[in-house]
Design a protein with these regions (language model features):
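Hydrophobic small-molecule pocket/channel-lining residues, especially in calycin-type beta-barrels
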Residues: 1-162
Length: 162
């Protein structure tokens, strides 16, 4: 009977270390672009990010949006075998699971995905960017490509460590 060695345990990569730097509590200045050409609606939020082991983050996002409590959850990680970041998002105002994949481009993580839009009643292509300013500051933006092919900015979140 031969003994088979166990495969080596996966080790965190540089990308996992970048995600680990997001752990903690963040104050968020939100700008929501409800209608193209109109001033954004502004709100403040708080996001708490925790590590799940060495590979994943889970976040809890909370704010008051249009006079109602808004809560969202995100999970984010990096898949070394596919050389890509992966992320999901759910929130209390939508029955849709958002799923994004993407890569790091300089100091920005750029991810894309498709999700059903309750507003347009169609599947829209979404693009999110997260620009790393410092260990204590980052800027997140979300865009959607509308059915006519025009990309619009949906939101900007400016994160500062609390």
């Amino acid at each position: 009977m031969s003994e088979t060695a166990s495969p080596p345990m996966p080790q965190p990569t540089r990308e996992h270390q970048l995600l680990k730097e997001h752990a903690g509590t963040w104050k968020v200045a939100c700008k929501l672009y409800m209608e193209p050409g109109q001033p954004p609606m502004e709100a403040t939020a708080r996001e708490t990010i925790e590590m799940v082991g060495e590979f994943w983050t889970i976040s809890k996002y909370e704010c008051d949006m249009m006079g109602m409590p808004f809560v969202g959850r995100a999970m984010m990680g990096y898949e070394p075998h596919a050389n890509r970041f992966v992320s999901t998002w759910v929130d209390c105002m939508s029955p849709v699971l958002f799923h994004f994949t993407g890569k790091e481009k300089g100091d920005t993580i750029v991810m894309e995905g498709e999700a059903f839009s309750c507003m347009t009643q169609s599947v829209l292509r979404h693009r999110i960017t997260e620009k790393h300013i410092s260990k204590n500051e980052r800027i997140f933006e979300m865009f959607a490509t509308m059915p006519d092919g025009k990309e619009i900015k949906m939101m900007t979140n400016h994160y500062r460590r609390a």
